[in-house]
Structures are given as C-alpha cells and as structure tokens.
Amino acid sequence: MVFSLRVTLTGIKGFFRVYKVNGATTLYTLHKQLRSDLEFPQDQLIMFKALDPDGSVLGRYGLFDLGSGTVDQVSLEKAVAAGVSTFVYFYDVTNRKSVTISIEGEEPGLRISPDSPLLAESKGPNPIEFENGYVAFEDLPDKQRVLPGEESDEDLDDEDFEDEDLDEEEEEDDEDGKEIYDESE
C-alpha cells in the first residue's frame, strides 16, 4: 500500500512537498528523508505528533519512547490503521520548529520501496528560507501582488501626485520666465 503525504508549513501558501510513501516505511525512514530533502539540522531531537481528523492527539513518537513507541517501530500503515490523518513533525523540538504532514490518501497501483520515499511534487524553497525572511508571492498582501508590466492602483495615485509637483514648479517661475533663486533650497 502506498500513501500520498503532503508536507506544508502552517500559514504559508508558497511551500509544499508531496511524497509517495510505502505503508511499510517507518517514521524514522520518513524523518531521514525529510531531514535530507528539506535540509533540517541533523543534531536536533525530533518528534512526530499524531492527530486524528478532529485534531485530537493520538500519540507522540520520538527517537526515545514517549509512550506510544519509537519512530523506528511505527510504520505509516500502523499509524493510519490507528486513525492518524495528520502528523506534526517537529524537526527541532527545542525551538518548536515543525511542518505538517497530511495523509492525502492511498495511491493504487504504485510501487515504492519502503526504504526511500519518493518526492513527487515540490513548491517553494526549503523552510529555512522562510525563517530568513523569504516571502512567497502567494503570501504577499493583495496590494503588493503586482507582476512586472502590470499597474497597481497605487501606481495610478502616484501619477496624480507627479502632476501636482509639475504645477508647483511652474508656479515658481517669475512672470518674465526666469526662475527665482531661493537660498533655502
């Protein structure tokens, strides 16, 4: 059985990854793949928080047993059978840095090794870029979403102000057409 998983950052539209993962894949194997693909630090404790469709916590899985088992004992199949629909994957527990992993469904007829999840779709840079100030176009406020070559409403307002500036310059000319010199400028 192969599952489709969507990895997202909460509140950010400009980032996602879609993986095709064998049901026999352990959470530890998934962790190693995510850490590699998304360039997460290797020296941090990790945790998978399993949630049901209502958002209730079903279990927590880490490198050490947190009461529900360790990441190398729990396969994706077992988690889905237990009712898990979403994981919050903390790749840096200390600093509470996480991504959301949603189980989108089964992929019939697809064969994938349990040892290597397949990255099927990708959008946006890695999460570290968002921490460094990167803002995806989709996440910009509507008034800042202007493509090159398009005019925004603000550009039209600026043109009106430029016309007023020209009128003021014309008023500064003397009656005989000579410009008046002002020392304060």
Residue ranges and their predicted role:
Residues 1-185:
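Short linear regulatory motifs enriched in tryptophan with gly/pro/ser
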